[in-house]
Amino acid sequence: MSQTTIASPQTFSPAYNPLKFIIDSTNKNNTGFKYIFQVFEAGTANKIGEYKMLPRIGDGYGEQDLSKLLQTQVSWDLNTTSTSWYNAPNSRYLYDVKVGEEQLAEYSWTANLVNNGGNVRITSTNTFVVGDQVIITQADSGVANPQLEGLHTIISATGANFTVNVAFTTITDITINGTVNYADNRKLITLNVTTFEDFIAFNGAFRWVDWPTYSQTDYKLTLANKQWLTNQPEQFSCTLGQDLYLNLWGAKGSDRIVFVNSNGASFYKGINNLDEISQVPVGPNNYGTLVGTGTLIDSTVDWYEVYYFKTSGALDSFKYRINLDRRESITEYDILFLDRLGSYSSFAFQLKSYERGEVTREIFNRDVEGYVSGAQWNYLTEDMGFMQNNINVSKSFDLNTNWMTQDMAQYFEELLTSPQTFVKSVEYICGEAPTSSTYQPCIIQNNSYEVFKQRNKNLIKQSITIKLSNQDNVNG
């Protein structure tokens, strides 16, 4: 028995793209053969899934896509109260895959049949014990030895041969070959023939056109051309009130996130990766306390860059530039959203906004009972006929962005399709000191959108409608 790996995912792969394991086995043509794929939490006996697969038509390979299973094991990380850094264990799942196989417990013989005390003895390695019911199939389908064909009982057995309850005197040709199997079609199961260990599925989804060229080396932060786990453009405009929580896949241990502003001043925050993925707040409103002289952002700073630093004197990731947007706004709402690679970025909505409320209620008509006084029926003017209950209030907002670049407009699609979105309002004191409300979960109401191109529209802005996920309570 041997297996060959035909294909497997890369060790670090997004959970929302195909994660196919394809195996070949030398036993694939055996009767009742199936591949067994077992999936475990890495390094443990905690089995999260098991699949038995028939060989593919044509090549006989065993193929299993584990993406649906692993999607149930990843979620997202977000801590809006932290401005330092934190490990992001919910954004990834470590797993092992062990591939085995099963087949019908079938044994063949080619040696001559032997007389064993008047009964037929067959020479073949086997696992039978006395009393087992077996089915014998001869090469000639029982033409020469019809009494040996079919269902019989084992009356003696060793690991090398076995005897069945068939009189040897009925045998006319001792040279006929054949096979024998348990009457209940018992299977032989062999597990852990091929093992894949310490694979990582992270909360990510690549576009159809991008997935075929995906390489995990693009996201392992070791060189200046490596990317964080985000699709946020390398140049991105943010207001002073915006938050960014970006994920990265760095080496474990003590590292630095370096900030350099347009005046050339350099700052950093130390991180200590204990997990495969870390989340780092890097937005203008949430970069936190940095080591350096002065402040990262003041009235003279137009932009700042942020990158990952591991090796002394080296740049270990792309530089992500944050251009500071100081355009005065009528009112500002910021929407924080989960992007396609598991980071939380945000867009500011600085132009006119409209807040609307919707009330739903149940109304029923009740009989006015009134009262009897002085042998006359009467009622109070406060008595109610129509009554209402189950009153619910929901809030929605129409929001409009300011002008943005084409790259930002394309990235905006990820906000519109994000399953996790949060909104906050921002006010500015003297234009430079933002004060924010707390984040509230919301739902994007837009069901269609246009992807703008600058060749068709020089000035690009977006409009959306959101609805708060939670309703205010109404007393009765």
Regions picked out by a protein language model, each given a short descriptive name:
Residues A88-N90, A157, S299, N392, ...:
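Surface-exposed coil/turn segments at beta-strand junctions on protein surfaces, enriched
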